[in-house]
């Protein structure tokens, strides 16, 4: 069986795996279906299509079971909702429990129960019921969580009936478990059961373990064997997350781990980076008091919307090397595993990436538009001192002999991933793709069609459109279209926020249909297009909230501030003055009072309204508008 070279997890939790022999495996977003594409033989014709096998995950044959299991393990480690097929999980990894484990309770911050400091410097926080625990290494850049999760179920009504039948027995089991828990304290004790033996192998801990209240789980497993119909099958799921982007359900135990690690460091006298810890704990310090975490639930065995599955087929005519080809799936990338190195991305307000070479160190993208600089964080084993280095993408150092990894190749690979995500964020389709497992009732799906916030047409320049998904489209008269991301949070949140650009890239579409991704800082020959759109966006964010339609009923061109509308106002004002003779009548007012009395009633009303003060104010506004026009022309360099 061929080994994996690259595994990619996308934002919709779909997976693509590339093997060393050229074969590929694709996993649907829900995990219930997969497509295996065999590598074509050497003697195959260039136009010959490779052999493809498409199967349900629950009914996978033995030829692809091991490969599919590793792909699912990779998916479940980083996905929002795991997919756990009972037919693929090994028997030693299954646990039968009578109660429904849907949430866990963590210890209080004031007590030291369930908190363990291991010899490797890792802090482990265990839940009071023993159904979950969190591990934070001494680097404090990422953490792992282990929790019990019920295997994927069939979408039928029999599950609801079985849950109702188990409701009465659940209370009795909880009562028994509570009595067992009162016999011992979790403080300074370790777990000891079948699952915890696996924990000790992973953590390589040499500390002696003692029995605790969680031993009741082992008793429940024995008790449940005579009544298999009344039990639920669970398995342990391991997930890895970044401290900088912690999910909501793990924020409280992470705050406990960070607090406990700081306490141990202060007692041992280890110098720590206080500034970095404050940055990491800024989002989790407010989680005190949220001791209960709702555990993620596994997806159903069968997909509710299999018609939404999309498969990408490789092109046999263009054989590219691994890691150098573009990602064929039109979706944002969440995690990439490439030759032992993990790349983790976040897409909240801007694209950022973290590189984990596997030795405990990490690279983080930095800079005004993330991706121009990378900061390297590591801890020396001898002195346990933190080391930080900053690398510029345009000036990477050469490879050093004997180094465990190439800094140049890692950062270049990360830059390619960021560029792919920039293309997807500037695409017109990725926000509108409907994910299959998000169609299940009860799961929030916030992906809706964007609303048109503002549309302006400038004669001689083009049309500008701003949407609620932070996209800006500019269609110039010469046929070139520019697309960029601009944060219009003030439109929806009813507050003035001028965060500006969320990407350091913009996309140009030429009249022949070709696209080009260019850096906004260095637009080169396309500077006039970029500066014109950015000026329009900056002016748009300065408009007051009262003038911004949150839900426009129609896409009527808005020209309240544009140059064309101001010029049109000036022309109308001059025409009004010329037709009514206001200037002549005002200058000769003292000499021609008799003629003024002969004017029609409408002219008398106009004379009273338009006096010398109003004319001076209008001229002052006209001069300001002309200055704005000059500044716009000088900046755009037409």
UniProtKB/Swiss-Prot annotation:
One Pfam family linked to the record: C5orf34_2nd
InterPro entries, per database record: C5orf34-like (IPR053901), C5orf34-like_2nd (IPR053899), C5orf34-like_C (IPR027865), C5orf34-like_dom (IPR053900), C5orf34-like_N (IPR027830)
Bilayer-crossing regions: none
Protein name: Uncharacterized protein C5orf34 homolog
């Amino acid at each position: 069986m061929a080994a994996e070279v690259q595994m990619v997890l996308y934002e919709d939790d779909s997976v693509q795996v590339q093997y060393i022999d050229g074969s590929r495996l694709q996993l649907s977003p829900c995990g219930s279906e997969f497509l295996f594409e065999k590598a074509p033989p050497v003697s195959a014709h260039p136009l010959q299509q490779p052999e493809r096998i498409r199967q349900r995950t629950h009914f996978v044959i033995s030829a692809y079971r091991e490969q599919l299991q590793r792909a699912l393990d990779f998916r479940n480690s980083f996905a929002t909702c795991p997919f756990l097929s009972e037919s693929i999980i090994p028997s030693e990894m299954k646990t039968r429990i009578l109660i429904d484990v849907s949430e866990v309770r963590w210890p209080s911050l004031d007590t030291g129960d369930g908190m363990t400091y291991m010899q490797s410097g890792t802090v482990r926080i265990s839940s009071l019921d023993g159904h979950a625990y969190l591990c934070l290494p001494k680097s404090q850049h990422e953490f792992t969580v282990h929790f019990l999760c019920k295997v994927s179920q069939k979408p039928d009504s029999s599950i609801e009936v079985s849950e109702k039948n188990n409701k009465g027995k659940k209370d009795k089991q909880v009562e028994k478990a509570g009595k067992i828990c009162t016999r011992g304290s979790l403080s300074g004790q370790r777990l000891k059961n079948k699952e915890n033996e696996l924990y000790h192998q992973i953590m390589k801990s040499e500390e002696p373990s003692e029995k605790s209240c969680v031993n009741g789980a082992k008793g429940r497993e024995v008790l449940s064997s005579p009544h298999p119909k009344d039990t639920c099958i669970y398995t342990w799921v391991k997930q890895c997350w970044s401290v900088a982007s912690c999910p909501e359900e793990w924020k409280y135990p992470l705050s406990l781990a960070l607090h406990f690690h700081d306490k141990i460091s202060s007692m041992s006298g280890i110098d720590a980076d206080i500034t970095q810890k404050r940055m990491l704990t800024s989002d989790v310090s407010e989680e005190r008091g949220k001791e209960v975490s709702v555990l993620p639930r596994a997806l159903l065995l069968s997909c509710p919307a299999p018609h939404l599955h999309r498969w990408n087929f490789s092109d046999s005519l263009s054989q590219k090397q691994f890691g150098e080809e573009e990602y064929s799936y039109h979706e944002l990338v969440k995690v990439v595993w490439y030759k032992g190195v993990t790349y983790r991305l976040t897409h909240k307000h801007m694209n950022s990436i973290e590189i984990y070479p596997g030795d405990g160190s990490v690279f983080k993208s930095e800079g005004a538009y993330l991706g121009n600089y990378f900061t390297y964080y590591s801890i020396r084993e001898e002195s346990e001192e933190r080391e930080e280095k900053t690398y510029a993408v345009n000036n990477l150092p050469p490879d050093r002999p004997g180094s465990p990894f190439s800094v140049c190749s890692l950062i270049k690979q990360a830059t390619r991933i960021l560029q792919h995500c920039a293309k997807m964020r500037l695409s017109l389709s990725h926000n509108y793709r409907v994910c299959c497992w998000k169609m299940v009732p009860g799961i929030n799906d916030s992906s809706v069609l964007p609303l048109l916030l503002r549309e302006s047409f400038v004669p001689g320049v083009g049309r500008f459109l701003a949407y609620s998904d932070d996209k800006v489209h500019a269609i110039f008269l010469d046929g070139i279209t520019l697309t960029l991301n601009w944060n219009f949070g003030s439109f929806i949140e009813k507050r003035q926020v001028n965060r500006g650009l969320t990407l350091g890239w913009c996309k140009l579409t030429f009249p022949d249909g070709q696209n080009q991704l260019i850096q906004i800082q260095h637009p080169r020959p396309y500077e006039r297009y970029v500066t014109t759109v950015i000026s329009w966006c900056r002016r748009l964010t300065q408009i007051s909230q009262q003038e911004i339609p949150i839900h426009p009923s129609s896409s009527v061109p808005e020209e309240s501030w544009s140059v064309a509308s101001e010029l049109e106002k000036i022309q109308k004002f001059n025409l009004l003055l010329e037709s009514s003779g206001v200037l002549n009548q005002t200058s000769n007012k003292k000499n021609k009072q008799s003629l003024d009395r002969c004017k029609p009633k409408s002219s008398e009303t106009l004379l009273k309204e338009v006096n010398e003060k109003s004319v001076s104010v209008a001229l002052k506004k006209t001069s300001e508008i002309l200055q704005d026009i000059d500044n716009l022309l000088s900046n755009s360099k037409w």
